[in-house]
Design a protein with these regions (language model features):
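Acidic, gly/ser/pro-rich intrinsically disordered tails
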Residues: 1-14, 29-33, 50-54, 77, ...
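Short beta-strand/loop turn elements enriched in aromatics
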Residues: 38-56
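A eukaryotic "domain-to-IDR transition" signal
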Residues: 90-98, 105, 111-116
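Beta-rich strand-turn-strand
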Residues: 68-100
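Residue-level preference for beta-strand/loop junctions
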Residues: 13, 33, 59, 83, ...
């Protein structure tokens, strides 16, 4: 059995991808009511070609990104198609059989279960707004109500 530290299994492959969002964020809910946001990121390698003295694109890789619970709500409000992002998370692979003529073959998809998502600040600026969770909001509302009733 794999060990776990802060929710990350030690045998998981954790990776960071810097790229562009290529699909609008979709929000759905599990049967238990947990929010799940998903989007796709494309990343391309770039290298300098000394012969042409120009930067050239290499292969492009696409990753489906899944965000859970509070992060899902934040991503829905913050991430849009075309946005440069940095995504850190656990790599997941899944195989889907696809028919190909007489013989079937398997297509392998690589997904990222996000630990963190943010804008790529090498390509722009951002403004951060801390989100207050329900328990904090309730506590502040009770404090205000107590102050108003005692005045």
């Amino acid at each position: 059995m794999a060990s776990t530290y802060r929710g990350v299994t030690m045998n998981d492959i954790t990776m960071t991808v810097v790229g562009n969002v290529v699909r609008d964020v979709e929000l759905r809910f599990t049967t238990a009511g947990d929010p799940v946001a998903s989007f796709r990121v494309a990343t391309s390698t770039r290298r300098f070609d000394r012969a042409t003295e120009k930067w050239v694109d290499g292969d492009t890789h696409y990753f489906s990104v899944t965000c859970w619970r509070g992060m899902a709500h934040n991503v829905v409000q913050s991430v849009v198609k075309g946005m440069p992002v940095v995504v850190t998370g656990r790599l997941r692979s899944r195989e889907v059989p696809r028919p190909c003529g007489e013989q079937g073959h398997i297509v392998r998809y690589h997904d990222i279960e996000a630990i963190a998502v943010g804008p790529d600040l090498a390509r722009g600026i951002a403004t951060f707004t801390r989100v207050k969770r329900d328990a904090v909001v309730e506590s502040e509302e009770r404090l205000i109500a107590d102050v108003l009733t005692s005045a």
